[in-house]
């Protein structure tokens, strides 16, 4: 049994509860447009792309999850730490509940939000989302000590991915697949434990 499983079993004997985003966070959009971007500006400007651009003014100063309202639905996620500006069609999810670690929520969104959106889609693709869809998304709430332990493990994989990116692309792909596997296992909260590695050290 892994440390995560031991903690969940000991601290959550009745199982892990889930809560919808509307009970945990504030959700809203920005008010900036792409034309407001300033090359070389001091603040990140989150639009609807994989990488933020720059701007010379900021709207928010906090830790939040950013997702696009159009394009890249379920594939683009950012987490902010400090001052930033936000596009009028990008969503800011700012957690106000003391029961959740934003970094944990970020990893959970990255792992589960796309399938949540697709399960409610009327077609094979989703080109845009609205605030009510985000508010209905359910997030598990294991004790903070469990959330922090999961974040620590996934941060390690994230840091390793960044180091490998400049070195070996093939190795990076293997590590990314490993990261995604363990991310999904750690965040599944079902009754089937992840497979244990065989052999001994």
Language model features with spans:
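Charged, alpha-helix-forming regions
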Residues: 1-201
């Amino acid at each position: 049994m892994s440390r995560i499983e031991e903690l969940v079993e000991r601290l959550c004997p009745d199982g892990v509860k889930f809560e919808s985003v509307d009970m945990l966070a504030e959700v809203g959009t920005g008010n900036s447009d792409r034309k407001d971007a300033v090359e070389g500006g001091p603040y990140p400007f989150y639009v609807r792309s994989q990488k933020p651009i720059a701007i010379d003014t900021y709207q928010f100063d906090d830790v939040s999850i950013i997702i696009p309202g159009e394009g890249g639905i379920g594939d683009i996620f950012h987490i902010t730490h400090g001052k930033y500006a936000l596009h009028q069609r990008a969503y800011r999810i700012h957690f106000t509940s003391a029961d959740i670690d934003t970094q944990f929520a970020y990893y959970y969104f990255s792992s589960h939000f796309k399938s949540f959106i697709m399960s409610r889609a009327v077609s094979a693709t989703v080109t845009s989302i609205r605030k009510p869809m985000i508010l209905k998304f359910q997030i598990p709430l294991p004790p903070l000590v469990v959330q922090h332990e999961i974040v620590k493990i996934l941060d390690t994989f994230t840091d390793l991915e960044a180091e490998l990116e400049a070195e070996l692309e093939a190795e990076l792909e293997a590590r990314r697949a490993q990261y995604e596997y363990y991310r999904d296992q750690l965040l599944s909260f079902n009754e089937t434990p992840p497979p244990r590695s065989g052999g001994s050290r």
